[in-house]
Amino acid sequence: MRISKPHLRSISIQCYLCLLLNSHFLTEAGIHVFILGCFSAGLPKTEANWVNVISDLKKIEDLIQSMHIDATLYTESDVHPSCKVTAMKCFLLELQVISLESGDASIHDTVENLIILANNSLSSNGNVTESGCKECEELEEKNIKEFLQSFVHIVQMFINTS
C-alpha cells in the first residue's frame, strides 16, 4: 500500500520506529547504540573517499611509468585554501586528458573511479563559488608527474579540513 500524503508517511515511520524501539532496544545499552547510530548517520564520511582518491592517484602514477605520455597539464601548484574547490575541479578536468592520452583501459577505469569519488566528496562544497581564483587555463602547464604530485597535495588539504 502506497501512502501519498507525506504527513501520513511520517506517522507510519514513527509507528514502525516505536515498535522497533519497544521490541529490540529495551535495554539502556540498546538505546545508546541506537542514538549513536543516528548521530553517526549524519556525520560526513568524505575522508575515506579522499584516501581512496590518493590511492587511485598512486595507481595512475604506477600505470603511466611504463608509458611515454608527453602531455602538459594545467596544474595549480600553490593552492590557496579559499580556492581549493575551484582547483580540484580543474584537476579533475585535466585528469581526463591523462585518460584520453594514455588510451589504456586500466588508466581510464581508474580515472573514472577517481572522478566519481572526488565528485561525491565535493558534493557538499561543489556549488560553492570561490572568488579571486584562477581559471584552469590560467594555471601553469606542468608534466604529468608534477601534476599528480600537486593533485595529491590538494587532496591532502581536503583530508586535513574534513
Curated annotation (Swiss-Prot):
General function of this protein: Cytokine that plays a major role in the development of inflammatory and protective immune responses to microbial invaders and parasites by modulating immune cells of both the innate and adaptive immune systems. Stimulates the proliferation of natural killer cells, T-cells and B-cells and promotes the secretion of several cytokines. In monocytes, induces the production of IL8 and monocyte chemotactic protein 1/CCL2, two chemokines that attract neutrophils and monocytes respectively to sites of infection.
Inducers of expression: By interferon-gamma.
One BP term from GO: positive regulation of natural killer cell proliferation
Propeptide cleavage-removed residue intervals: 30-48
Entries under SUPFAM superfamilies matching the protein: 4-helical cytokines
GO molecular function: cytokine activity; cytokine receptor binding
InterPro entries registered for this protein in UniProt: 4_helix_cytokine-like_core, IL-15, IL-15/IL-21_fam, IL-15_mml
Signal peptide: 1-29
Taxonomic lineage from the root: Eukaryota, Metazoa, Chordata, Craniata, Vertebrata
Tissue expression remark: Most abundant in placenta and skeletal muscle. It is also detected in the heart, lung, liver and kidney. IL15-S21AA is preferentially expressed in tissues such as testis and thymus.
Protein name (record): Interleukin-15
Glycosylated residues in this chain: 127
Keyword Glycoprotein: yes
Family annotation (Pfam families): IL15 (PF02372)
SS bond list: 83-133, 90-136
This protein's GO CC annotations: cytoplasm; cytosol; endosome; extracellular region; extracellular space; Golgi apparatus; nuclear speck; nucleoplasm
Family, as annotated: Belongs to the IL-15/IL-21 family.
Keyword hit for Ribonucleoprotein: no
Keywords, ordered alphabetically: Cytokine, Cytoplasm, Disulfide bond, Glycoprotein, Nucleus, Secreted, Signal
